[in-house]
Amino acid sequence: MKRFLLNNGSEYSYEQLLASLNESDKYYLLYKQLDLYLFFVNLIKALANNAPLVLLDADLNETEIDGVNVAEINVPTKIVSTTFVNMEAVVEAVKTPTSEITIFTSGTTGQPKKVVHCVQTLMRAVRFGEKYINQVWAYAYNPTHMAGLQVFFQAFMNLNFLVNVFNKSRTEVYALIETNRVTHMSATPTFYRLLLPFEKVYQTVQRVTLGGEKSDKKLYESIGMIFPNAKINNVYASTEAGTLFAAKGDSFQIPAAIRDKFLIQEEELLIHKSLLGQSDSFKFDGDYYHSGDLIEWVNEANGLFRFRSRKNELINVGGYKVNPGETEKVILEIEGVQQALVYGKANSILGNVLCAEVQLVEGSTLTELEIRNYLKEQLQDFKIPRRIKFVDSFSLTRTGKIKRS
C-alpha cells in the first residue's frame, strides 16, 4: 500500500484515504480539528467536490478573528459527493475546482486577517511529474496556513508520503527523518535553528527549503552540514499572494514574466492585485498592494533584491530607524547563540529602548559582556540593545515563527 501520512505514530495509506473520502456525503465548511489525518480528509473532500472551505486553527478562540459564526464550526454540510475509483481521479478533481479557500494570516505582529484564495493561486508553485512521485516530505508547518497548504499540495498532488514533524522535539524530528528516509523538507528558519546542535548527518534529504522569516549565512552552513546531500533554497510567500519568488543565494529574483506586477515605492515592495487573494484588509495604491516588506536592490535590471525588514518592525530609537533583523543577524553570528529576538520597549526620552532576548545553545557559557563586545565591533551604538536577557525558549506563532508582539 502506498503511504499517505504518518502522524503521531499512526500511519495512513492512500487506500485508507480513498475509503475515507468515499464513505460520506458530508463535509465541514468550518472545521476545527487537531487530528491531521481528519483535517486532510475534509480538505481533500471539499476540493475534490468543488465545495468552499474556511480553515481554522484547532486552538482558535472567537476573540481572535472576525467574520466567523462560532455556532457553525464543526457542523456537517451535505454535498453532492463523487465516488472516486482511485486516488489519481481524486488528484485530477483537486486540480480544477472553482471553490474558494478562506485562510487567516499568522498573527506574527497582530490580529489575524482573513484572505480568500482560489485553489489555482495556492498551487501556483506546485510541480507535477515522474521525477516527483517518490519524494518523502517532512511536514513542518501548520496545515491551516499558506506554507502548510503549499507543502501539502506539492506532496499530495504527486501522491507522496507526508511525515508530520510540526511541534516535535529536536530528537523526535531527527528520528522521524532517519526512520522514514525523508527526502524533502520545508520549514521556517526558527524550526531549523531548533534542530541545533546536531550529532550526525542525514544523507537521504535531497532538498531543504526555508521561508517565512529572514535567514542567515550561519544557519545555511549548519543546514548544509546536517543534510550534506541537500540543495538549499529560500522562498518568498505570503498569505496574501502565495508563493512568488525563489532565492538565488541570499537574493530573490522577480521572474521576468511577472516583473510588471511589482513596484518599489520608498523601498517597499508593492504587488499587483492580480496576484492576490481577496481581503477587506488589503491596502492598495491604485492596483498595487502594499506588502509591508522593505527591500534593497542587488541588481535592479535583473530583478534581484534582498529583503531588509518588515516596515512595521522598524524601531524608532532616539530618531534613528533601527531594523531589528540587522541586529539579530549579528547576534546570531556569535558562537553559542541559537536564537535571538530584538524589540523596542517604550521610553519617554528616546521613543524606544532597544532590547534583546537571546537563547543559547545547550552547554554554552557565553556571557552578556561577550555579546556586547562583539556587537560593538559590528554595529553602530544605537543598533546595540541596551538590555540583553537570556531565555530558555521563545513564544511562536501558529505557523512556527517567533512571535514579535
Q: Could you tell me what each predicted segment is?
A:
Residues 3, 82-104, 131-137:
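Conserved pre-ATP/AMP-binding loop-to-beta segment of ANL
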Residues 20-60, 139-142:
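Conserved AMP-binding/adenylate-forming
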Residues 99-127:
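Conserved AMP-binding A3 loop
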Residues 123-136, 144-184:
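Conserved AMP-binding/adenylation subdomain of ANL enzymes
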Residues 196-252:
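Gly/Ser/Thr-rich phosphate-binding loop
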Residues 264-304, 320-322:
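Conserved ATP/PPi-binding loop(s) of AMP-dependent carboxylate-activating enzymes
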Residues 292-383:
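AMP-binding/adenylate-forming catalytic core of the ANL superfamily
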Residues 380-401:
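AMP-binding/adenylate-forming catalytic domain of the ANL superfamily
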